Amino acid sequence: MSKVLKVGLLLLLVAVAASAYAVAEENGAPKENKQLPQIDDYGVTNKCPANQPFKWNCNYCTCGPEGKDASCTRMACPQH
């Protein structure tokens, strides 16, 4: 692979990463200083505050419009 192609691919990767970060910020990604409700039993009850962000264990979620079926990050949480 030529050096020019490698540099081009690297620049493309950086641009995609920067775009993804900007979109996450626009979509209201949780800020570290923002206090979100912690719902530890979401995995059992599947209930959450409709259309609201919350934390489930170490993951960030946004609840669905009917108060269930949230969309969450999928980080592996450390065991306590």
From Swiss-Prot:
Signal peptide start-end: 1-24
Lineage: superkingdom: Eukaryota
Disulfide bonds: C48-C63, C58-C77, C61-C72
Keywords for this protein: Disulfide bond, Protease inhibitor, Secreted, Serine protease inhibitor, Signal
Propeptide segment residues: 25-47
Entry comment describing in which tissues the protein is expressed: Expressed in the venom apparatus. Low transcript levels are also detected in other tissues.
GO molecular function terms noted in the UniProt entry: serine-type endopeptidase inhibitor activity
Subcellular location: Secreted
Ranges of residues in domain Pacifastin: 45-80
One GO cellular component term: extracellular region
Family as reported in the entry's similarity comment: Belongs to the protease inhibitor I19 family.
Name by which UniProt lists this protein: Small pacifastin protease inhibitor
